[in-house]
């Protein structure tokens, strides 16, 4: 089931809506078996996404969100309102103390973001 849906914007009718799903996958480094935030880079998370069919899952979640918004949001337009998906690999997120010390405030380890493939979602909506 979908973990979380959030609107990003000032007003609900103008917001982009995002699906958030958290994962507890263990991604170890090539030279060790430790589970460290550095192991949760884009390439490793992409590989994990494909391995576990998460792109398919994200499409199904976005289709469900698309149908909900079409039903509930007046003047819904997928290209304006459907944002995409965020996968949070919990074991890859940096410790808050490290984040507070960071000058760049980079929290990208453990965060995998994708835009909604609008044409594909519309096609799936018509398909079934």
Regions found by a protein language model. Give the residues of each.
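Structural signature of nuclease core domains in nucleic-acid processing machines
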Residues: 1-128
């Amino acid at each position: 089931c979908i973990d979380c849906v959030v609107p990003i914007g000032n007003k609900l009718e103008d917001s982009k809506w995002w699906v958030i799903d958290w994962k507890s996958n263990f991604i170890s480094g090539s030279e060790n078996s430790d589970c460290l935030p550095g192991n949760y880079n884009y390439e490793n998370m992409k590989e994990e996404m494909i391995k576990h069919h998460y792109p398919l899952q994200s499409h199904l979640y976005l289709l469900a969100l698309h149908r909900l918004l079409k039903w509930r949001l007046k003047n819904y337009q997928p290209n304006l309102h459907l944002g995409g998906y965020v996968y949070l690999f919990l074991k890859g997120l940096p410790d808050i103390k490290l984040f507070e010390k960071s000058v760049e405030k980079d929290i990208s380890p453990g965060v995998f973001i994708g835009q909604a493939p609008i044409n594909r979602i519309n096609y799936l909506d018509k398909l079934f």
